[in-house]
Amino acid sequence: MEGAASDPYRRPARRTQWLLSALAHHYGLDRGVENEIVVLATGLDQYLQEVFHHLDSRGAGRLPRADFRALCAVLGLRFEGAAAPGEASEDTAAGDTNSGDVISGDAAAGEAAEWDEDAEEEARLALRAEPPELTFRQFHARLCGYFGTRAGPRLPRGALSEHIETQIRLRRPRRRRRRAARPPGPDGGPDGERLARLEEENSSLRELVEDLRAALQSSDARCLALQVGLWKSQAGAQEAARGEPEAAARELRQARGALAAAEAQAGRLRRGQAEVRRRAEEARAAVLRSLGRVRELEALARQMPGLQRGLRLLEGELRRYRSEGTQLPGPSRASPEPDTKSSEPEDGEARGPEPPPEGAWGSGNSPASRPPGPARASPGLDEQLFRSVEGQAASDEEDDREKWQEAQRLPAEVTALLAGLSGCGSGCDDQTAKKLMTYCSHLGGANHAHTLGELETCVAMLVEQLGSRGCGAKTLRTPEEEAELQRKVGENESLRQELQMVEAERVRLSLLEEKLEDVLGLLQRLRDLNISKKALGKILLSTLDACRDPAHDGPSGPLAVLEALHRALAGCELLRREPSAPASTAPALPHSFPISG
């Protein structure tokens, strides 16, 4: 029970505490002395039976443990060392927290005077663990045992209250007592009549009190049952109210976690989008640079005909400059074939008549194709004769070639001097130089070999004559003409190299244009197949990453990037699943880059 400072029994009992006050008054805790409490305490068993009956709305004769704890909460009963009723655990194995208090109270009550049999039964039932459902005896024992362990002197039990407190009677309609009419006493008179009248009034008052007690008990039991139901509903609402903030807080934490995850995902997507945009800008800038270079090369290619015409003019001017100087005609070579007619008599005189060639004999079996003679030559003799003729002809041809080469060998000094004479620009005797060159051109036979010394002597005389005239052998042109000629030759070479570079660049751009057309064709096909932007961007980014990878050992440059992009697009799953279409049905690309040759 609560402490003395907040003990409700120190004050006049409220109606919600009638049951507590009646129990306290019955067990000697005389703290409420109101008349209704005294009246209710005279029939405590019926009072508890009314309360149990109203709480047992099912009529099963058993009260659930939750309802009993709710009743204790309504009454304000709190056992020492135990939680509030309704908050205790549902596990019966944990034991009844009230048992320790009852045991201690039982030990304290053992020092009191003698207990009757009902008190011992109540204490014994109170020691048991609280079952899931309570019968009326358990309900009665637990409520009475709580006060019995703390009880003082019990109220005296008289004969007038024995019919109420001796046993627990079942609830049934009350029967009025009918007293038999008393015969007048022997000592009749005013005193006897007055005594009889007082006894009758006492009996009537006792019955009235009993009726009032029954009505009060029934009314209070009904009120307690309603309060228990209200407390249970409020406890459920409070439990739900306590659980709702926790559930709301849990949902709020989950929502915040989901929001943080979504924000992180959005941040990653924004960073990825920025990276894709940056790489797309880089690719766009690279394509624009390539396009600008292509246009520059197109402009250079359009200038190529003019460059070719200028190159042809320069070549013609170079030839004209070269032909301005007087050049002697080169020595005409004599025929490498020796004069067979002139050599035939000498050879014939030395060797005699030659046998006819192999073709003259024929290879047939007819008599006309056979060689003349009295006897027919054998095949082995014909072959031997053919080989001897062929060897002799080869040796003669080799001798003639050696003679011709010796005749053609002029001294190097003579050739150099003649070339110097032909390029002299200071008024030398051109006719003499031409005659010498013509003379040298006719030196081809063996009979002219003895004139080489005379030719050298003549050339030396001409050189001395030229030296006396002030014309050196190596004075071909003036320094200004030589410088101009060298400048023209350098310009010609630079133009030729530039032309080669332009041609190589044109070929490279042609390859680049073809690869661009292939890539644009694949992109058009993928767009017709409704490829997603995410997949297309992923292909582009993976291609750029592969080309920018330092471990990439392949070629670099726009053509390599386009080649890698073409392979990546060609390996797309959509194109593999697409049925192969004929090449004639491929759409024409509007964005081609023509390069004029």
UniProtKB/Swiss-Prot annotation:
Domain EF-hand: 43-78
Residue ranges that the Swiss-Prot or TrEMBL entry lists as coiled coil: 479-532
Biased composition (Basic residues): 169-181
Keywords, sorted A to Z: Coiled coil
Region (Disordered): 85-122, 160-195, 322-380
GO biological process: positive regulation of transcription by RNA polymerase II
PROSITE patterns cross-referenced by the UniProt entry: EF_HAND_2
GO molecular function: calcium ion binding; transcription coactivator activity
Composition bias type Low complexity, residue spans: 359-368
Sequence ranges of Basic and acidic residues compositional bias: 336-352
InterPro entries registered for this protein in UniProt: CCD48 (IPR031601), EF_hand_dom (IPR002048)
KW DNA-binding (keyword) present: no
Protein name: EF-hand and coiled-coil domain-containing protein 1
Organism, as annotated: Bos taurus
UniProt gene name: EFCC1
